[in-house]
Curated annotation (Swiss-Prot):
This is Tol-Pal system protein TolB. The keyword rRNA-binding does not apply. Belongs to the TolB family. The gene is tolB. Keywords: Cell cycle, Cell division, Periplasm, Signal. It is found in: Periplasm. Gene3D superfamilies: TolB, C-terminal domain, TolB, N-terminal domain. Residues 1-19 form the signal peptide. The Tol-Pal system is composed of five core proteins: the inner membrane proteins TolA, TolQ and TolR, the periplasmic protein TolB and the outer membrane protein Pal. They form a network linking the inner and outer membranes and the peptidoglycan layer.
Length: 419
């Protein structure tokens, strides 16, 4: 498995996704009870209500309370309070010329319906889902005090197989998996997507010329830039927090090692040395260190490289396989791929050390990517013999599966905040 991960350029991934459907597999009793009143009967109004419900469910922080008439119905705040709701979102949608006017109110059902938040927006018809995600962010922040992640995006690799041929694509979608767009399509493998800190570009590995090359691509324009194209391995690109550098894995001098590429000048600096294979670099959010996977201790483990003095220290000691590690944005935890008893699951460890706790338990999990608010981990897994995406909370109490309607989905990457 270690060779399979460190030699990313050899992998042939399969999968294709059109949209993702939320399926909650585990929840918590402490979720905040909230009701979403219908925004209206037309398609736009129904979509807004559905998106908000879906978003708040994905967060793991809310329990949706339905009115007497079920979802997408209109009930009084007092009625919804009797059904257990602590908060109520109410809205309306009106046509104003060629624009759509959307208003919403967040009320405290416990405090006699006191208004906590109310806003009105005018949008174009193609902005309905985006506005619904924005409303979810507003509601989430008002009730939790933390910034919402519903207007962020995810990237992933998908492959469609037909007639003995494969079609690889780099997809970008909303955080809930809807609104997928193909940035790149190729008959050769694409892998290792990684978002730039400003969310405007994605780095990735391409085999379109029958060899591994590292590119960046603009999410808005699709314009590409070739970063490295050396003989052998060009893999595992990861952005520095300031967006000025990429850490990459190159084997141009023999054994795969980690290099820093200055994106302005193109100059490179080798960061790791020796005879061991070093791979999967990830910058710390403060830019002071790198996490990476290495076999220098005899088995694949996670190490930390200080960028100030080049000192390397081992991070993981539990088990004989830990890889693909990254910090949560708040730097409180390290999320990784952890193997025990031949089962590959997503694990988490406190940044200061200590035991590794499993967040998932399917034994077929990989490619963890942390949400920008540090609360959720997006990962790839298998379900009913297909590649799908899963989400697990950083404390392991919330687990969700987002099965694709068609094909497989793999190598997800969660964007940073986009505004």
């Amino acid at each position: 498995m270690f060779n399979r991960i460190i030699s990313l350029f050899l992998l042939l991934f399969t999968g294709q996704v059109i949209a993702l459907d939320l399926e909650l597999t585990q929840g918590i009793n402490s979720a905040l009870p909230i009701a979403i009143n219908s925004f209206g009967s037309d398609a736009a109004a129904q979509e807004i209500g559905n998106v908000i419900e879906n978003d708040l469910t994905i967060s793991g922080q809310f329990k949706i309370i339905s009115g007497p008439q079920g979802a997408n119905s209109q009930s009084s705040v007092s009625t919804l309070r009797q059904l257990g709701a602590d908060s109520v979102v109410t809205g309306r949608v009106n046509q104003v010329g060629n624009r759509i006017e959307v208003s919403f109110t967040l009320a405290d059902a416990v405090a006699n319906g006191n208004i906590l938040l109310t806003k009105t927006f005018q949008i174009n018809a193609n902005q309905v889902r985006a506005l619904a995600h924005h409303i979810s962010d507003e509601v989430y922040q008002k009730l939790t005090g933390e910034r919402g992640i519903f207007s962020t995006r995810i990237a992933y690799i998908s492959v469609q197989r037909a007639g003995g041929r494969s079609r690889y694509s780099l997809e970008v979608a909303d955080a809930d998996g809807h609104n997928p767009q193909s940035l790149l399509v190729s008959s050769e493998p694409i892998m290792s997507p990684s978002w730039s800190p400003n969310g405007k570009s994605i780095s990735y590995v391409s085999f379109e010329k029958k060899k591994a090359e590292i590119f960046t691509v603009s999410v808005e324009t699709g314009q590409r830039r070739l970063i490295t194209s050396f003989p052998g391995i060009n893999g595992a690109p990861a952005w520095s927090p300031d967006g000025q550098h990429l850490a990459v894995v190159l084997s141009k001098s023999g054994t795969p090692k980690i290099y820093d590429v200055d994106l302005s000048s193109g100059s490179m600096k080798q960061l790791t040395f020796g005879n061991s294979i070093d791979t999967e670099p990830r910058y710390s959010p403060d830019g002071r260190s790198l996490l990476f996977t290495s076999g220098r201790g005899g088995s694949p483990q996670v190490y930390r490289l200080s960028l100030a003095d080049g000192q390397i220290s081992r991070v993981t000691f539990e088990g004989n396989y830990n890889a693909r590690a990254s910090y949560t944005p708040d730097m409180k935890h390290i999320v990784m791929l952890h193997r025990e008893d031949r089962q590959f699951n997503i694990g988490v460890q406190n940044t200061g050390g200590g035991p590794i706790s499993n967040l998932t338990f399917s034994g077929l999990d990989e490619s963890p990517s942390v949400s920008p608010n540090s609360r959720l981990v997006l990962y790839a897994t298998r379900y009913q013999d297909r590649g799908v995406l899963g989400i697990v909370s950083i404390d392991g109490r919330i687990r969700m599966r987002l099965p694709a309607r068609e094909g497989d989905v793999q190598e997800p990457a969660w964007s940073p905040y986009l505004s």
